[in-house]
Regions:
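Small cysteine-rich, disulfide-bonded extracellular modules of the LU/uPAR three-finger superfamily
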Residues: 1-131, 138-172
Length: 172
């Protein structure tokens, strides 16, 4: 006679004491489109962007006071380009063939509560091509540290038009 028996006893004890902190990054873009006579003809809004690794690193350096370039009125620029490649965290700026970076308008960026607002004007001779990608950088080119990148088609800017781009980011 062959007798077999199998048995498994398992006891597990654990304490699930964990702290989970989260922060939400909520970007909201706005483009005001003016014709050559400065008549407003369209306002377009969209949400979202991807934080770029180089921008995150620059923010962390600023947070702890190490050497970094601030995203302030002297250094911050909004960039627009015609790139259509999906945003990826490892990118280091705009990817399109045509691109332009414009400095902040006077008094920008601004902070109110938990929201920072960046704003720049693209005048009659600036950025006259398809607008498909957007960024905020701490300099006037892709070699600066780009904070973020958004990809969305907002049409072609015509010679003579002025488009004002604004980004509000709320962190909560």
């Amino acid at each position: 006679m062959l007798d077999k028996g199998f048995g498994i006893d398992r006891v597990a004890v654990g304490a699930g004491i964990g702290v989970n902190e989260t922060a939400k990054w909520r970007p909201k873009w706005k483009i005001e489109k003016y014709d050559g006579d400065m008549n407003l003809y369209a306002v377009e809004e969209f949400e979202g962007n991807l934080l770029l690794n180089e921008g995150i690193t620059e923010l962390l350096k600023l947070l702890i006071g190490t050497t970094a370039t601030a995203f302030n009125n002297t250094n911050a620029y909004i960039g627009v380009g015609n790139g259509t490649t999906a945003a990826a965290a490892g990118q280091t700026g705009l990817v399109g063939t045509n691109k332009a970076y414009k400095p902040m308008d006077a008094t920008f960026p601004q902070v109110s509560g938990q929201t920072v607002t960046f704003r720049a004007a693209f005048g009659p001779d600036d950025g006259n091509y398809d607008w498909r990608e957007f960024t905020v950088a701490n300099g006037n080119s892709d070699s600066a540290k780009n904070l973020n990148r958004a990809v969305e088609n907002h049409g072609s800017k015509a010679q003579g038009d002025t488009w004002i781009v604004q980004l509000e980011v709320t962190i909560s």
